[in-house]
């Protein structure tokens, strides 16, 4: 009878994972993991909503793995972790897809097509990939609640968003204004400032820059006699904006000059003079004179506009003072187009430029002669209907015709692009609704100090600095598919009125409700919400109507509202939300410090005066092997589903969680997924093999493992050691994932947790199991053998629970296979508790001896490798010379035996002193000695050369022999370097410090040579077993063909040992040329001077 399943050592992990997925689904393990935990002990994390109009990529998978690992961990720590999945439905991604598929482009086309039909298409297409998303999420082993998830386009969600806007308005944090903002002419909408900072939105752009003459229109005193015309030189990288130039700016803290060339004076900054002189030299121009011009004399100087379109504007076309003008930027004089530059707009507004005598609801009218698609309007006759980027050459041509052109150069500069269409943005004056973030900034900075960021530097670095420079947030978009800006205003400015609504039905006393004024509301989307109109109550004529402003809200406003909108707060779940906010945990990639994390922070501060989350992991980015962004166009990454099939989802998960990408670094992923393959080989398979090893031998011996509840009677030092190391692993994972100290925030260092698991797996497989194989192989069922089984079974019990959040599939398979039936799933079990391991601390000294033994072995193996002495070749002796290490001197014989067995050496001697095997070289720190005792440096050098010194207990060094001249130097004023005197010796480093020297005897006797040959034969038999596909306990029939006398003798001497170690039922020697009958049934492998033929024994059939 087998107590455990037959576990193969090299399984198809994807098949195992699919079986586990079926088990989870059929047994509803996820649902049970939530429902069995008390609501009184909830752990809240926010699942940021992805757009569902495309398939998941590795960035989504990485985020999902981190979320799932933390959620599983916290569940096993006793918390109730609800995991609602959300969908981001509104905004440009959906609209751009609809435009492409419907063949419409731009607002005019959409309005002609029909807003209702356009939005209906967006509604249906946005959820197109939800099934594929679900398949990806489930296949990666992530548990989420799809059935009770939220969608930002749902009426309940949108009502909460409407309430949030109303609350901010009510608190005086929302206003409407005209500002110059980043504008996507491809999407025909303004963008927020943080959208230009995300996803590497800046690209290198080659533009034509132009230097232009602005001719003065009045006489000025600083112009010398004989000069017929005077012009100011200004430089710009956007020549198309010159058609709406309204002013020039200088910096009065800079120096300016006038250069006379012929009958013309050209004015520019002193810093531009060298560039100007080189220009004159290239063009054979003679600069006759350069005069200094006080900057203040340039202020208010009038000039003639380069283009006539707005020449009648009042207060315009003069020189202004501006601090933003910088030395080294062009000519030191900036042309101002207030419709296309933020600084230009603010400076011109300050000076009343242009003053058209028109004010509308407190907003300054600005000449901005382009339409929504970035084309010039009829106000600019020569360029009407042309796109701003298409008129550059024509503008330069006209400047030349007017005699205003001075120079054209190619300019490569970093330029913002639309995050959705990858087209270059423009800056455009436009009307928008703003959240007044500047009012909240100081409070946000304070609240940020209460958040635990991973990595820690984000708090004061990327996020902290972003908060320091926070600007008011443009939250309205001139688009169609989104939550409406809930503002209605009078259509007649003679009877102004503005209403802001915060609910559909009248539920909250201080919140204006739509149905109070408009009747039943079925849909909050356009065009239905636009059709809600009513007479203006403040118009006694009854003619004006209250109409909604046509904008929709930025989709970032919606995702930033998800903590409460997913619950339909405050209309439902108010008590629950109030008691479970802020979230305990959140994670996304690091650029969300300027995106989702930021909008969550703004809205949470504005609405609740609280930070929105307590702990935040900012993970890095997955790139291709060249460091490029993963791209369908470049085809530079492997399909995630193929990686799951090839290596298993656990391997992909652990690759990401254990890498620096989980704490903000970047992961380079090659086309074949080699980094994932390496994880499978170095982490997943070793853990699996420890499980496989147990089941194979336990079934063979008919042994049933028992969890050790008590450590009484555990006498084997290997058992003591691995139990202690298991406890250390659990403690390290707990410390990495959370602090046990009251009031200390959770660090959530998943990478450290994974490192602890990897380190323990290495010790379990490469030290404990390998070192204890003989205990499992012995025929008799001794107490020691039973102890080995119970110890390994206990370790696997704790290991399965510890790795469950990080390797959920194989953890579950191990749990079910070893019949740990305390819970029907490892994910329903409790995470190991450090307190339950308190008894193993009695084995700490044991572990120190064992680590020292491992370090000694490592150095012996390094020496062997350096001298090409294979490990299978036994050596006669090794000698250890301790240095300041009592543990080496008094190491018990059991540990010495382990060393000998591990490194294949017959005897180990431990000397009492280093003797002649090595010596110390004294190196003095003359810089420190010269500062402290300059008068004694010569004496110290003399004493040091004598070579008599002694290290004192406090670490200082006593120079000189007793009874003679002596001197003490401090421990930081010298160092002792150990120098070995034999090429077959080396230092022993343990715990990072030298603890002695070891020497190996490399002389080989005939007996040693023959044993080495026998071990070489054994290795090739083991390789033949593997090639033949034999399982661990399968017996083999072996034939060795050779005429080599030494090989024959070695086989004869070590015959029984070879059979036992290789599980060979028969072992037969034949001459080299002997014919092997029925050769096809054998696997053949050749060594030097011999061939091995191996097949599975008939005993195994």
From Swiss-Prot:
GO biological process: isoleucyl-tRNA aminoacylation
InterPro entries: aa-tRNA-synth_I_CS, aa-tRNA-synth_Ia, Anticodon_Ile_ABEc, Ile-tRNA-ligase, Ile-tRNA-ligase_type2, M/V/L/I-tRNA-synth_anticd-bd, Rossmann-like_a/b/a_fold, tRNAsynth_Ia_anticodon-bd
Alphabetical list of CDD domains matching this protein: Anticodon_Ia_Ile_ABEc, IleRS_core
Principal location class: cytoplasm
Cofactor(s) required for function per UniProt: Zn(2+)
Motif 'KMSKS' region mapped to chain: 629-633
Binding site for ATP: 632
UniProtKB keywords: Aminoacyl-tRNA synthetase, ATP-binding, Cytoplasm, Ligase, Metal-binding, Nucleotide-binding, Protein biosynthesis, Zinc
Any GO molecular function: ATP binding
Entries under Pfam families matching the protein: Anticodon_1 (PF08264), DUF5915 (PF19302), tRNA-synt_1 (PF00133)
PANTHER family (UniProt xref): ISOLEUCINE--TRNA LIGASE, CYTOPLASMIC, SOLEUCYL-TRNA SYNTHETASE
Record's subunit section: Monomer.
HAMAP family named among the record's database cross-references: Ile_tRNA_synth_type2
Function noted in UniProt: Catalyzes the attachment of isoleucine to tRNA(Ile). As IleRS can inadvertently accommodate and process structurally similar amino acids such as valine, to avoid such errors it has two additional distinct tRNA(Ile)-dependent editing activities. One activity is designated as 'pretransfer' editing and involves the hydrolysis of activated Val-AMP. The other activity is designated 'posttransfer' editing and involves deacylation of mischarged Val-tRNA(Ile).
This protein's name: Isoleucine--tRNA ligase
